[in-house]
């Protein structure tokens, strides 16, 4: 990374906000660092230290193969996250230094990501005939029905009592995705009804221009959120299941709106949770997956071309090892000093899917680099069982995104990418 880029990142990260904001961010970071030395954290502290050393010395060696072993480890970690919760959902993640007071390191269940984890686990179960994994996914789907809001929406943030719930379009779309998969698997009318209520709420939430109005309380306000177009894929899927064209047309309208935010160089505006000037690869991945999957399903070559335009601008920033910076400015200069591992996995998924459609191996080759790098960051052996099989939020783990822990969605997308890589190896 160029010195000028590093200076730009430091300036925007530490000197652009108010002094108060910088102070509280630094205080929270130091509290997490101090927590590493709390009793019982020796094993996790060792994981953090080894990761920092590997990052500082560029000592990560990508791993080829081992897909089945690593996919199984990822699934087992997700199931441990479900077992840690009393309700059937999956814990938001494993954060030993900041678990919200739970004491176990595992946070409470998270409806949004439990939703799309259902799809991943059912795909894994189908590929290997694993009924136990499928049963676990269905318990998640039933729990999601139990906590669905009366309006048909899904709450934003970790699960909370009904009186504290606030609706969020993105979260609703991700749970709709899980319900679509659960209905295809089970044929349960109760799940179909929940999915319909969610799909109807999402369609009604679109404004005249095709953007979702209800972003929820956990993201920055006062702007559209381009990445919410991933909901369109779930809406389109429901349209295919129900046989009703109006859902498909609403999904297409949502993607067309998102593409109005794409710049000539492929970068998307208004495309982050909190920093639209420098979106995460995580939210870039959400946007690209939504655009691509609806494009493939609807036969819209212009959607596919838009995804190609972004990838062709973004992928040259990936190192030969598979390391990818976690944020990007509008000129495609890196905007972060750490990697957002969820985003790397998501972009690998998009690359595999695009390669399969276009028949261009260069996209699959890029995906392989991303996935093989992530494999090297997945621990298969640790004295802390909460770390085994998981993918961290950032590399290093003290990096900017979901610091000091393992959000469940990082491991979910890693699992999806592993399954796509394995499918490619079989062809």
Where are these regions (language model features)?
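Glycan-recognition and catalytic cores of secretory/periplasmic carbohydrate-active enzymes
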Residues: 1-427
């Amino acid at each position: 990374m160029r010195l000028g880029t590093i200076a730009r990142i430091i300036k925007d990260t530490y000197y652009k906000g108010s002094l108060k904001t910088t102070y509280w961010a630094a205080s929270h970071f130091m509290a997490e660092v101090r927590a590493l030395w709390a009793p019982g954290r020796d094993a996790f502290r060792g994981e953090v230290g080894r990761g920092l050393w590997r990052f500082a010395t560029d000592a990560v060696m990508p791993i080829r193969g081992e897909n089945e072993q690593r996919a199984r480890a990822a699934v087992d970690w997700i199931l441990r996250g479900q077992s840690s919760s009393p309700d059937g959902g999956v814990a938001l993640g494993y954060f030993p230094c900041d678990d919200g007071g739970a004491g176990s390191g595992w946070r409470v269940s998270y409806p949004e990501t439990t939703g799309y984890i259902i799809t991943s686990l059912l795909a894994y179960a189908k590929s290997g005939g694993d009924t136990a994994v499928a049963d676990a996914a269905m318990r998640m789907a039933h729990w999601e029905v139990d906590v669905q809001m009366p309006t048909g929406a899904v709450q934003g943030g970790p699960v909370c009592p009904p009186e504290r719930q606030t609706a969020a379009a993105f979260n609703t779309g991700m749970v709709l995705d899980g319900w679509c998969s659960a209905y295809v698997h089970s044929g349960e009318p109760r799940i179909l009804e929940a999915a319909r209520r969610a799909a109807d709420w999402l369609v009604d939430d679109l404004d005249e221009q095709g953007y979702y109005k209800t972003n929820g309380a956990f993201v920055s306000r006062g702007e559209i959120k381009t990445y919410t177009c991933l909901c369109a894929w779930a809406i389109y899927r429901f349209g295919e299941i129900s046989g009703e064209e109006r859902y498909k047309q609403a999904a297409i309208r949502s993607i067309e709106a998102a593409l109005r935010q794409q710049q000539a160089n492929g970068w998307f505006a208004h495309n982050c949770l909190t920093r639209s000037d420098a979106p995460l690869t995580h939210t870039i991945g959400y946007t690209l997956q939504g655009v691509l999957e609806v494009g493939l399903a609807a036969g819209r070559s212009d959607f596919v071309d838009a995804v190609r335009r972004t990838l062709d601008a973004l992928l040259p920033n990936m190192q030969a090892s598979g390391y990818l910076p976690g944020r990007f400015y509008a000129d495609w200069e890196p905007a972060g000093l750490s990697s957002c591992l969820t985003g790397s996995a998501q972009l690998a998924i998009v690359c595999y899917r695009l390669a399969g459609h276009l028949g261009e191996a260069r996209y699959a080759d890029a995906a392989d680099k991303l996935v093989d790098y992530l494999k090297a960051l997945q621990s298969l052996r640790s004295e802390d069982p909460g770390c085994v099989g998981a993918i961290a939020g950032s590399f290093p783990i003290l990096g900017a995104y979901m610091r000091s822990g393992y959000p469940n969605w990082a491991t979910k997308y890693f699992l999806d990418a592993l399954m796509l890589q394995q499918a490619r190896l079989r062809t």
